[in-house]
Swiss-Prot record:
Residues 601-638 are annotated as: Disordered. Signal peptide: none annotated. It comes from Bacteroides thetaiotaomicron (strain ATCC 29148 / DSM 2079 / JCM 5827 / CCUG 10774 / NCTC 10582 / VPI-5482 / E50). Keywords: ATP-binding, Chaperone, Nucleotide-binding, Phosphoprotein, Stress response. HAMAP family: DnaK. The modification Phosphothreonine is found at T197. Induction: By stress conditions e.g. heat shock. Gene3D superfamilies: 1.20.1270.10, 3.30.420.40, Actin, Chain A, domain 4 (3.90.640.10), Substrate Binding Domain Of DNAk, Chain A, domain 1 (2.60.34.10). GO terms for biological process: chaperone cofactor-dependent protein refolding; protein refolding. Belongs to the heat shock protein 70 family. PROSITE patterns: HSP70_1 (PS00297), HSP70_2 (PS00329), HSP70_3 (PS01036). This is Chaperone protein DnaK.
Length: 638
């Protein structure tokens, strides 16, 4: 039996691993790197480049360089409108209401672009193993819908791979982390914040059994969004300075994207970074430069809402698992965006423990996929993986209601049947409209397919008995059947993404030399002081907003005056004035706080002050609305 490779098909980067010599091995690509950028470029002469070579030429070829394609996988046109405006390449509406990438008039589906990345990973593994590879385990975000999972499987098929299993990314990470601990009894939380998606999964393992207790997340929250807040800030700064809009220039937009990503990465290890983009755009015929210093504190204030958006899925996952935070033995961080210090602090504060640093966030998912491949080939024995379906599945019934057959966090594989009936006399046909989501009404959930069951024997309303069966396989992919018990007639469909893909083979990709990057050193003391001032400004503004009317006007005025002094000192980079202003803010805040306590005005016992973290969760409605659908023509038999 040949090797089953494990592939982490990521939004920003991809990684491939294989189980060899009784351990999983991460395979370096032809550039010598263990991760490969999920970037595809179309260059002159019909050549395609994948990975680092594609990423390197993106600035000079922005409209034909494709990145973050994972965010379009398995989605319809209406669901990706925000993503379309963020990328410099052209995305258009294609067949079956799906998004397509337009390259010189040729429309590529997201599956085809993803297949080119998978082809690169396949070739990387083949070069390492010295043999052809035809089978793979591919990972997906835990919160991927049925259509997104099916699209991933199709991408594998186009790349010439038989996808033996689709595994949730946090589950794969837990498998890699716990392989040598499989016989210990542990409960772990996997916090996976990648380039485009966020997942939180709660798992329990012991005796070789890995069981997912719950999962939650957001398939449109990740590193791309953190990049975007930096891009938005740079665009606004340039507009303020020069009166021109950088988003109207695809090449400038691509340069902003790369600069924002680089700045974000540098701010995980530095407190400040300089963004220097010479000749970014001509204004009235004069070339203009964009040079800005971004501190970590400023970045965290820009990304505050995104960071806080990670909290609610964590709370929901813990609630669904029926556990308290103290029950968790270990917290595992996965995904490049989990390196952001503010994200790590949020995780530590929420779970009450320091996250484990024992895994590589960029590689652990691919390692887990390789472990699952070895389980399937019996190279690893005594390990059982019990995953769950992330979202509820059901059908539309009378009145546009969603009737659930399989609840979220049900262990898969799973099978469930329920009996329904007709909604009108002598009805000879019913439409089975299959839905996925947690909302009560069908129109509020995602439509993932529909089919008709015809030939029902004429009878009065409510008499026929239609048995609907949902069958979810180990990949989380759904098959639905409907059977008329009276006539025995049956109709079934395997829910698939409406991709309209042809199955032609994708040509192999070429790769070039590794990229080089440089970072300039900064004057540490000065940057630390500016960073501290930035942080105090942000926290002071936050607390003034929270205190609102509780803080009398005569107490608020000196605080606002001191705050303005600090802003002026920060702008002029006068370090002595910064120290004076910060001390003044601290003094006036403490005076106001003490007087509020004395007057009984303090609420909840929390002291206000610029040294405290006053960030609050940003309440967000993250519900995703599906397409409008017709009312069903049958009702549930009670």
């Amino acid at each position: 039996m040949g090797k089953i490779i494990g592939i982490d098909l990521g939004t920003t980067n991809s990684c491939v691993a294989v189980f060899e010599g009784n351990e999983p091995v991460v395979i370096a690509n032809s550039e010598g790197k263990r991760t490969t950028p999920s970037v595809v470029a179309f260059v002159d002469g019909g050549e395609r480049k994948v990975g680092d070579p594609a990423k390197r030429q993106a600035i000079t070829n922005p409209t034909r360089t494709i990145f973050s394609i994972k965010r379009f996988m398995g989605e319809n046109w209406d669901q990706v409108q925000k993503e379309v405006t963020r990328v410099p390449y052209k995305v258009v509406k294609g067949d079956n209401n799906t998004p397509r990438v337009d390259i010189d008039g040729r429309l590529y589906t997201p599956q085809e672009i993803s297949a080119m990345i998978l082809q690169k990973m396949k070739k990387t593994a083949e070069d390492y193993l010295g043999q052809e590879v035809t089978e793979a385990v591919i990972t997906v975000p835990a919160y991927f819908s049925d259509s997104q999972r099916q699209a991933t499987k199709e991408a594998g098929q186009i790349a010439g791979l038989e996808v033996k299993r689709i595994v949730n990314e946090p589950t794969a990470a837990a498998l890699a982390y716990g392989l040598d601990k499989a016989h210990k009894d542990m409960k772990i939380a996997v916090f996976d914040l990648g380039g485009g998606t966020f997942d939180i999964s709660i798992l329990e393992f012991g005796g070789g059994v890995f069981e997912v207790l719950s999962t939650n997340g957001d398939t449109h929250l990740g590193g791309d969004d953190f990049d975007q807040v930096i891009i938005n800030w740079l665009v606004q700064e340039f507009k303020n300075d020069e009166g021109a809009d950088l988003t109207q220039d695809p090449m400038a937009l691509q340069r902003l994207k790369e600069a924002a990503e680089k700045a974000k990465i540098e701010l995980s290890s530095s407190t400040s970074t300089e963004i220097n983009l010479p000749y970014i755009m001509p204004v009235n015929g004069v070339p203009k430069h964009l040079v800005k210093t971004l501190t970590r504190a400023k970045f965290e204030s820009l990304a505050h809402g995104l960071i806080q958006a990670c909290l609610e899925p964590c709370k929901k996952a813990m609630s669904d698992a029926g556990l308290s935070n103290s029950d968790i033995d270990e917290v595992i961080l996965v995904g490049g965006s989990s390196r952001i210090p503010a994200v790590q602090k949020l995780v530590e504060d929420f779970f009450g423990k320091t996250p484990s640093k024992g895994v590589n966030p960029d590689e652990v998912v691919a390692v887990g996929a390789a472990v699952q491949g070895a389980v399937l080939t019996d190279e690893i024995k005594g390990v059982v993986l019990l995953d769950v379906t992330p979202l509820s599945m059901g059908i539309e019934t009378l009145g546009g209601v969603m009737t659930k057959l399989i609840d979220a966090n049900t262990t898969i594989p799973a099978r469930k049947s329920e009996t329904f009936s007709t909604a009108a006399d002598n009805q000879s046909e019913v439409t089975i409209h299959v839905l996925q989501g947690e909302r009560p009404m069908a129109a509020q959930n995602k439509s993932i397919g529909q089919f008709n069951l015809s030939g029902i024997a004429p009878a009065r309303r409510g008499v026929p008995q239609i048995e609907v069966t949902f069958d979810i396989d180990a990949n989380g992919i759904l098959k639905v059947s409907a059977k008329d018990k009276a006539t025995g007639k049956e109709q079934a469909i395997r829910i698939e993404a409406s991709s309209g893909l042809s199955k032609e083979e994708i040509e192999k990709m070429k790769a070039e030399a590794e990229a080089n990057a440089e970072a300039d050193k900064k004057e540490r003391e000065k940057i630390d002081k500016l960073n501290q001032a930035d942080s105090v400004i942000f926290q002071t503004e936050n607390q003034l907003k929270e205190l609102g009317d509780k803080l009398p006007a005569d107490k608020k005025a000196p605080i606002e005056a001191a705050l303005q002094k600090l802003k002026d000192a920060h702008k002029s980079q006068d370090l002595a004035a910064i120290d004076t202003a910060m001390a003044e803010i601290n003094t006036v805040f403490q005076t106001a706080s003490a007087e509020m306590y004395a007057q009984g005005g303090a609420q909840g016992g929390a002291q206000a002050g610029p040294d405290m973290d006053a960030g609050q969760n940003a309440g967000q409605d993250n519900s995703k609305h599906g397409d409008n659908v017709q009312d069903a023509d049958f009702e549930e038999v009670k």
